[in-house]
Amino acid sequence: MISLLQKTKILSNTPSRAIIQIDGVYPGYGITLGNALRRVLLSSLEGAAVTSFRVAGVAHEFSVVPGMYEDVIQLSLNLKRLRFKVFSEEVEKIRVAAKGAKKITAADLDKNAQVEVITPDYPIATLTDPKASLELELTIERGIGYILAEKRKRKEKLPIGTIELDANFSPVTRVNISVENMMVGERTDYNRIKLEIDTDGSLDPVEAFHQSLGILMEQFQALRGDVDSPKVKEQESTFAVLEKREDIKAIPVSEAKISARTVNVLTKHRIKILGDLD
């Protein structure tokens, strides 16, 4: 019988990093379970990202903003790095307006009750001219995984001057797994899994672990509904064996694949069919 796992241990936990240990994993299951958890953690959890932006006076990404050190392409790269925690299911807008020579960071974004800026120190742009100004509007959405701008389906046309971005929604930035042997009872080949989970700070890493477990369990539960019950299969198999056994008992000794000498001996003892041997 395959034993169940032991209790999960949280070795360390911060807002953006956790180390989780799973003991008593059945031999050989460590890599299987660890890789499955890693894939789900990196690809299947919901997060928030900038999906598009508009700059006042800019028509496309190849434009130049007077007095701004970065071009619009570099600006878009900076915006993709920003991380947010969004509390609503709706698309959120957030703005920043700046004048004069200064460095603009995510901390300068206007306050929004539904949006928490996780990376306030990340740079957005640098104005080098005292007379320069920048008016910027960001669109922030929730999503799963990495979605290219051209793959994103829109229900309505975007305003002129809107620049769409490829969006990395995943709140998990890194997952490292290690598997080692441990002793359970008298066996020394059971597995111990250690998971190191790093997030962008918008999702607690232990909560990310629990969400990934939930996703895997839902997937396997869905599969279970399409598979015949093991007990039913076992019962059907038993009946088939019994029926086959009864058929064999009905075979006449003369037709059985045995030697003529054995047939003569059995016939002498009045054994006519194989069932008489019981």
Show where each model-derived region lies.
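C-terminal tails and terminal domains of large nucleic-acid-associated
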Residues: 275-278
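Protein-protein interaction/assembly regions in multi-subunit complexes
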Residues: 1-273
